[in-house]
From Swiss-Prot:
Domain Response regulatory, chain residue ranges per copy: 13-127
Alphabetical list of Gene3D superfamilies matching this protein: 3.40.50.2300, Homeodomain-like (1.10.10.60)
SUPFAM superfamilies reported in the protein's UniProt record: CheY-like
Function: Member of the two-component regulatory system RegB/RegA. Involved in transactivating anaerobic expression of the photosynthetic apparatus. It is a transcriptional regulator that is responsible for activating expression of the puf, puh, and puc operons in response to a decrease in oxygen tension.
Gene that specifies this protein: regA
Nucleotide-binding as UniProt keyword: no
Transmembrane segments: none
Species per Swiss-Prot/TrEMBL record: Rhodovulum sulfidophilum (Rhodobacter sulfidophilus)
Designated name of the protein: Photosynthetic apparatus regulatory protein RegA
Length: 183
């Protein structure tokens, strides 16, 4: 597949925050070949420190890190540099997490594994082009699961409150969550 040409702009600074070191190094090398100047961090604390000290024009942040959530890095960067283009990566692709990422300031959201071409396209897109419609739309069961997950996250993972909001018994919700939870 041919690489697309994108215009990086005057500031090619890029912060990559991911606790998967081999992926982090591979992505940094690939982004450097594309003209970015990557700076790497493996923790929320390190990512926030870089975002505060030297706010980059671009950022790629993993959602779940060992010491917390990447959304904290997104918030810090958005405060320090409102025009930054931020892409959130996650191995746990769900509508609820995508919505949360965009609400705190991410410009795009990609599920892992995402290659450097996908990341570059997301960072440099102008946001006007709509993504193509899915080839296989979600089933009704999947839509239900996504809705339950979204409400569960809104309730800070409180099962009793989530069950109340969804008008279902707490034990029913616990069974659903246990049955579908990633192992």
């Amino acid at each position: 597949m041919a690489e697309q040409e994108y215009e990086i702009g005057e500031d090619p600074s890029l912060l990559i925050v991911d606790d998967d070191e081999p992926f982090l190094r591979r992505l940094a090398r690939a982004m450097e070949k594309r003209g970015f100047q990557p700076e790497m961090a493996e923790t929320v604390a390190a990512g926030k420190a870089i975002a505060s000290a030297r706010p980059p024009a671009y950022a790629v942040v993993d959602l779940r890190l060992e010491d917390g959530t990447g959304l904290d890095v997104v918030e810090t960067l958005r405060e320090k540099r409102p025009d930054a283009k931020i892409v959130v990566l996650t191995g746990y692709g769900a509508i609820a997490t995508a919505v949360a990422a965009v609400k705190v300031g991410a410009t795009d959201y990609l599920s892992k594994p995402a290659d450097a071409n996908d990341v570059t396209a997301a960072l440099l897109s102008n946001g006007e082009a709509l993504p193509p419609p899915p080839e296989n739309p979600m089933s009704a069961d999947r839509v239900r699961w996504e809705h339950i997950q979204r409400v569960y996250e809104q309730c800070d993972r409180n099962v009793s409150e989530t069950a109340r909001r969804l008008n279902m018994h707490r034990r029913t919700l616990q069974r659903i969550l246990a049955k579908r939870s990633p192992r």
